Amino acid sequence: MKSVQEQMAIIRRGAVEILVESELEAKLKKSVETGVPLKVKAGFDPTAPDLHVGHTVLIQKLKQFQDLGHEVNFLIGDFTGMIGDPTGKNETRKALTREEVLKNAETYKQQVFKILDPERTKVVFNSSWMGQMSAADLIGLAGRYTVARMLERDDFHKRFSGQQPIAIHEFLYPLVQGYDSVALKADVELGGTDQKFNLLVGRELQKQEGQVPQCVLTMPLLEGLDGVNKMSKSLGNYIGITEPAKEVFGKVMSISDELMLRYYELLSDVDLAQLQLVRDGVEGKAGGAHPMESKKSLARELVARFYDQAAALRAEEEFVQQFKQKEVPDDIPEVLIDAGEPVWICRLLTDAGLTASNGEARRLVKQGAVKLGGEKIADAGLEVAPAGELILQAGKRRFARIKFLEKK
């Protein structure tokens, strides 16, 4: 096992805040002396079926703890998922059914093991203990926190001040998340910066239970491909970990050098010395790694993580062919459209699978990122005449061959 100082250097990497750092050092010191690993926890509510790399910031930090020899608890919030996390929301979130939550949870398990070692990961569901609670137990838990304390949360405070409704069950969410730490006797809990309040509730509940309070480590919310907004499927600025290898590679290659450095810090396994070479290259210092080569290395690393090394090399070869030689890929999907009335360009993009929604399609057109037959489309209201065959392109990497079928 590495020394406390060596472990802290790895743990600090990319972290926004460690509460309380001296307590974590003491926990690590005891772990080194006794050989007993720390219990490290991170919770994920299965509110959607697929993860993107923004979610993997926490999973990657869990992997670092795992590689340091600690016990990793990947907590699936199947109980909290049915409440709906109110964090950052300006309105009450729609709760999912148990069937939806369990279906999403199954895909989460498959996807996280692209990063975590399944043999050394404990997957736990918080319904295991919350589902056993009686109404009296739940009311007792609710009695441990006041409404005034809950309103210290920025999102609740804004909604209350703006006379927007807050449902009673939303106050239960941070208490249930906090109680998860009591049930697991967690030594460390990881979460995004937006989860800080909930993580500290866990510390407080552990103190009330007579447990040694967990240390809290917050990680930043990863910016999406635009480098501005939080990575989100609804904004179309995401890299999905189940996307085709060539898509993952191409999207990484599209980001700015500054954003690449951020992705290295939060997503990569490279050691601190190599990370410094990447940083020096981005800052233009002598001896630094060339940003283009660094970007390729990062793209290969992520593709290999989600697929394998062979897929990473194939994706790189295709990228070089497609973008260095400005070629349209050979294996683009073919989409058959019945010839008839003209088709709205945004609907065409969505039907072709190039965008997730008409809203995303409209944004891409406005950004000048859509081409039809090699010509840039500037009008989001364009009606495409159904004739022959056309190459439709969204962004730098997404193509479809549109074939209009003649009506008989």
UniProtKB/Swiss-Prot annotation:
GO cellular component terms, semicolon-separated: cytosol
Motif 'HIGH' region: positions: 46-55
The protein's Enzyme Commission number: 6.1.1.1
EC main group: ligase
Motif ('KMSKS' region): 230-234
Family under the similarity heading: Belongs to the class-I aminoacyl-tRNA synthetase family. TyrS type 2 subfamily.
Family annotation (NCBIfam families): tyrS (TIGR00234)
Name of this chain's protein: Tyrosine--tRNA ligase
